[in-house]
Amino acid sequence: VRGPLTKEQLEKMGYIVPDIYGDPAILLPLIYNPNVEKKYKYSVIPQFVVEKDFRERFHAENIISMNTNNYKQVIDNIKASEIVFTSSLHGIILAESYNVPAVFFRGLSKSVDFKYYDYYLSTGRPDIKIADTFEEAKKMSPLSIPDLTKLQQGLLDSFPYDLWEYKFWNKWQ
């Protein structure tokens, strides 16, 4: 599960949930991690549901769209940034997974969901700083980037490789 808040909710429903946290996106650097030179002072990743409105209202140096299938381009642009300002949960997760500082802002959506707190708690950061606007975010310092190694290893160790091999690979052999 993503974090302790999800675990708590599932346990209330009667499920047994191990203390293994992490969004699968934290594993991407283990799969795709090119060397990319920094070329942007900052980049902005708006939450996908407000991206169009954000682009119309703000002129940022580099706006990265999460509305794409080209994950390599997204990652390359994040890695090319000195810092990321984002209202997207996966903008935060990807930036931090690639050791790029991220500042979280509510943006046009104005909501802060359970899932954001769940992610931050999974990384050992109960006190998060949230900017209300992009302009406010640019004045803030990012939180320290967490060491995601233990979370990554927990996800890898808990993967049901035996089921994967049996159900999927044996069908095509």
What positions do the PLM features span?
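Active-site anion-handling motifs in enzyme catalytic cores
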Residues: 1-173
